[in-house]
């Protein structure tokens, strides 16, 4: 161990306060394959040197506190401390820089996203010496990944369960999200599924309210699924939201869904919490249920560029905690999401190995060592005119989810579903024939609408609808 990184905690105790950088800033440190690596965007208070701010982040998110303590001499600080091993400026930002911090693996409980986040981001974000702090990325080492189950099933197992290959899956969020009775809700589900969708979905805040208790909703949705399957010959599903006020109630709802023969359930993983989510993911694997994940509340954490946590970190955490689908923005719809950044974390969700690529916001090479992948879900303000772009951007291993873009069809839910299915099939066929979806997309949709009156009606309704606002979160 080099003299610069060694901490002589055992050579007598001297009370007082010393600069964090004397202990936690170690630019000569060589990172280990077992370290968890973090990239923080740091905005220090005026007068705080970058090295001191970076060291403070490493200290306060690992073994350090504001003063020297005599119990430092009872352990090996060098074994357990976090280390700020690199500082680099943020281009175009005078007062910001990226601090790279390495954490020894022994700081973390095996298989616990909850403990990982409690350590890395649990306390340091309120530190007075920092004006703002954002966790941009994490490198999760294979040794730690192997302590997690991850997604209940993964992409290939889901396709095998559904017997659907060679195209994105189609979904729809039932609207209005609140206020429908269980029977009318089930009717809307049935119409969408018989029209050609693969899935329908509870919205994130549909749990068990006075107008529609969860058990009634589950029963009517199961009836809709079976009826649509009998009519179409295709396997169908509805994301039954099992999110609840307690873990016990959540599992009770999941058990009932399994008893009904439902293929998939749903969880709001941020509002529900990582402990609840991991518990549900384990239940789903043990009982053959797919698990759809909604990211409700994510923008509270990830939207501001200078403070919080980037969604790519939340996406990695979800892959560890467990989920077969997760909402990931659309690039072209109503929700925030710049293209290169979005595709960066989409690859982190799906692929087994992702190289470092700063142009897409990926700070570290990530090896998932065979952990199953997660299907990204594109949802929010999308309609048939977006289908070519969505197919080109997200590829086959994705779920394209049209809520208003199905239920807002002038002829009703089933024709809305038909329009989306026809548009998707046309785009997939055109792509397979070698046509350029990005350049010829509108023409492909127009050609398909000539033999599909449902698609033609949808094209007319949404021909002027665009959501063109600059992204807040950019590279």
Swiss-Prot record:
Bound cofactor: record note: Binds 1 Mg(2+) ion per subunit.
Molecular-function GO term, any one: magnesium ion binding
Question: What does the UniProt keyword field contain?
Answer: Acetylation, Calvin cycle, Carbon dioxide fixation, Chloroplast, Disulfide bond, Lyase, Magnesium, Metal-binding, Methylation, Monooxygenase, Oxidoreductase, Photorespiration, Photosynthesis, Plastid
PROSITE patterns per the UniProt record, alphabetical: RUBISCO_LARGE
Locations listed in the record: Plastid, Chloroplast
Stated EC number for the protein is: 4.1.1.39
List of residues binding Mg(2+): 201, 203-204
Q: Which cofactor does it need?
A: Mg(2+)
Entry-annotated residues carrying N-acetylproline: 3
Reported modifications of this chain: The disulfide bond which can form in the large chain dimeric partners within the hexadecamer appears to be associated with oxidative stress and protein turnover.
Residues making up the propeptide: 1-2
Please name the catalytic residues of this protein: 175, 294
Q: What class of enzyme is it?
A: lyase
Give the GO terms filed under biological process for this record. Answer: photorespiration; reductive pentose-phosphate cycle
Residues with the N6,N6,N6-trimethyllysine modification: 14
The entry's family comment says:
Belongs to the RuBisCO large chain family. Type I subfamily.
Name the NCBIfam families for this protein: PRK04208.1
Spell out the subunit comment.
Heterohexadecamer of 8 large chains and 8 small chains; disulfide-linked. The disulfide link is formed within the large subunit homodimers.
**Under which name does UniProt file this protein?**
Ribulose bisphosphate carboxylase large chain
Gene label: rbcL
